Amino acid sequence: MSPLHVVILAAGQGSRMKSSLPKVLHPVAGKAMLHHVVDTAKQLGAEKIHTVIGHGADQVRASLEDDSVNWVLQTEQLGTGHAVAQALPALPDDARVLVLYGDVPLTRKDTLETMVADLDERNLALLTVDMDNPHGYGRIVRNEQGLVQAIVEQKDATAEQQQIQEVNTGILAVSASHLKQWLPALSNSNAQGEYYLTDIIAMAVDHGLSVTVSQPLNPFEVQGVNNRLQLAELERWYQRQQAERLMTEGASLADPARIEVRGELTIGNDLWIDVNAVFEGRVSLGNNVVIGPNCVIKDATIADGAEIKANSVIEGAVVGANAQIGPFARLRPGTELAANTKIGNFVETKKAVVGEGSKINHLSYVGDASLGRNVNVGAGTITCNYDGVNKHQTVLGDGVFVGSNTSLVAPVNVAEQATIGAGSTITRDISKGELAVARGKQRNIAGWERPKKA
């Protein structure tokens, strides 16, 4: 089969977005619309992806460093036909060419695979959709036998043609050799003075090609974004699809309308996810995991039976089986928690490896640290890991007990079963089983009186 090349049109200004950010870089599910389209093209096995850029070209190019993308500059925006023509020099004559759009981010791979499955020199493949309100879209004109004859844009359509409810999505596929023959012959003699890519449909019919039509499972797959309202509508549809998938796969959601999946979320069975949970990047949740309300979890692995309580933020961390996190805890990148650990309220960890059964229950910061098994860290404990230039390591052995309001000035090594008295500032290593107390001596002054106002 001839190679597949994908041309993505991403040169438009997007003035209705009212934004300095190029339209195709506005996010859906936490990822730029254009990046969704590029990822789909990769999943199709495209030999090369040609992305036509114009407005904000430097910004768009800088957003995606990818060797599989060939950037094509359209200096003047003269219509979709003109945009595709800019990519012609990079298209091999024997290639099959699929045209996608940078502001139509959620077309499914399966939909496109079906569309191009039988594409060859003898046909042109078209993706259409039926709409109750087709205003603004190009209409699919068929003959009495039901065969596609042309696409007529809204501004050029007759009153009769405007009653047609089957509309053009803009997505089509055809051989590169045909594109190289037809695109130079396009005319801009139309209501908008543009070179319409859709005019090649009539050319294909005139040259005896058959026009094969397929449709997506859901119209939202091919919904484009021209303003922030449409962006929000697309986001809600996507999130509803994610919620339905999660419930099908074994999660119970407190409210399917109040969950955000902005990446790849994989789950086990019998999960509970409360309202306003946000999942970003690659997140894996094991069996029987509980996610409390208002949690944000990014690029993390949560093992079986773990409970993430309300208002906790986890990023770049591994949480072991049956661990308890929060409420109001923050696990930063590099945190690795073993099974049965507990990270309580207002605790922050960073590059901290915490052994099985260890607890950091309240109001503490543990960074650049290694904790053994069954360590107890009292409230208000701080690892002083930064000297203004470098970060230093704190090591607590198995069974260490750290009293409340302790400062551990790194680098410092506390051996197993050692105990640190509350209120201590530890600057030296502590040997196995020792008690360390490092605080000012208490003085009680008899007969002292509080100052009085003059």
Swiss-Prot record:
Under Gene Ontology molecular function, one entry of this record is: magnesium ion binding
Signal sequence region: none
Q: Where in the cell is it found?
A: Cytoplasm
Entry GO terms, CC: cytoplasm; membrane
Q: Which residues form the active site?
A: H362
EC nos: 2.7.7.23, 2.3.1.157
- HAMAP family in UniProt: GlmU
Q: What is this protein called?
A: Bifunctional protein GlmU
